[in-house]
Amino acid sequence: MSKTNKKISSDINHTTKYGSKTPKKVYLSNKVIKRNKNDIRNISYKEINDEFSWGNYLNLKVIIMNDNGYINVTKLIQQANKEKKMGDWNKNKDSKNIVKSACEYTGLTEDKLFIIKTGGNNSTIRGTYAHPIIVAQIAGWASSDFAIKASVIINDYIAKQMFKEHEKIIEEKDKTIKRRDKKIDQLNNKMDDLLKKNDKMSKRIKRLVDTADDLRNQNDDINDKLDVVCNDRVVQSDTNTHRFVIMKNNSDKEDYEYHSIRRLKNSVNNAVKEYKELYPDAEIIMNLGYTPNSICLWNNIKKKLKSKRKIKGTGSDFNLRGDFTEEKLIEEVTKIHNSRFER
């Protein structure tokens, strides 16, 4: 091998622009050559001698140099189109542009893209050998059939590359979606936990409210018992200091609809005012301007009306039952109130 050929072979094997570089050594053993899968020399199928081999270049029988993969384009053109010659390609303006681009791409000078072999006594190997990167351009110029075959392969390669790119994009999107789905699941789980905690808290609050209501009612009952020991009948007096009022809530709240107020004369107005702060639409449906003992009166009312299943409630709050109307309530309370006076 000449020094020039060795230098070109070294440049090809170390370039990173053309095909894939072949840093591994090429071993010849029983004519089986192991190389990088992208090495153009893989098209070789039979050795001519130590320097050259026959190769199959898209069904074109070509001669390829063993050390650098250069292909005899003179013989390739003769085989593809007997009317064309290598000299014709060299004169072509497009060809010169291709050579220029190949030099820029490979980093080789123009004189290193081509090797001329005289062949000596062996005319088989005689001709111009071209760098593999421009062989397809020359073959396509010489043969329209080859150009179409090469176009199909190029399009197939581009399509496969783009398909791989699309798969990568889809894969990345799928990963992003999975990450987001996982995040959404985590947020949903947190939301579920918060809803459960809120539900538990709501139940606790309701229990506390119920307990507070019970305590308030118990307190009212205790106050009733502590404030007075009442009899069924009392003596009417001109100095009545107690007042008894029944309020109607007129509210959509899930509370009792009616409320009784038992207060001293000088505090009943404040009690009504405070109640209206809780229930702005509340109204007085009954106001006994005089009663000897409003606490005792209310105990008697509850006792008699509950026993007749006319009202239900706890403490000072109550609802009417069945067909027991507001008018009947006022009538019954008036009767109970009047029945307490001695005649």
Curated annotation (Swiss-Prot):
Disulfide bonds: none annotated. SMART domains: KilA-N (SM01252). It comes from Acanthamoeba polyphaga mimivirus. Residues 51-157 form the KilA-N domain. Residues 159-279 form a coiled coil. Keywords: Coiled coil. This is Putative KilA-N domain-containing protein R904. The keyword Chaperone does not apply.
